[in-house]
Amino acid sequence: MTFKFFSDPGHGWLRVDVASAQAVGLEPSSFSKFSYQQGHWLYLEEDVDAFRFIKAYMDKNNNIPVIREHSSDRPSVIRNYPRIAA
């Protein structure tokens, strides 16, 4: 499975759909208030939440998820999404 990692000059987020998180035993409430949710997409902050998902994914699937990076030199619109209610 392929996931996207978005970054701006200040931070980065791994985009994961809710169903993929649930497939590895995680719910939106498993993540901190520093991550965001827009519809069925979770944007997991890079410092803790993205690692939590990647570790759960690797434990469940015995492989590393494919991650494609997208970076911007401007503040990301992700910062305007609602925060996950932890």
Q: Model-found features: residue ranges?
A:
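A short, exposed loop/beta-hairpin motif centered on an aromatic-Gly-Thr core
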Residues: S32, Y36-E45
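Sparse, context-dependent recognition of short Cys/His-centered cofactor- or disulfide-binding micro-motifs
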Residues: M1, Q38, V66
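Short non-domain terminal segments
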Residues: M1-K4, S29-S32, F51, R79
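Short, surface-exposed beta-edge/turn micro-motifs
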Residues: G10-G12, Q38-W41, A50
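Short, compact, well-ordered microdomains
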Residues: Y43-A86
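N-terminal acidic leader/helix
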Residues: F3-S30
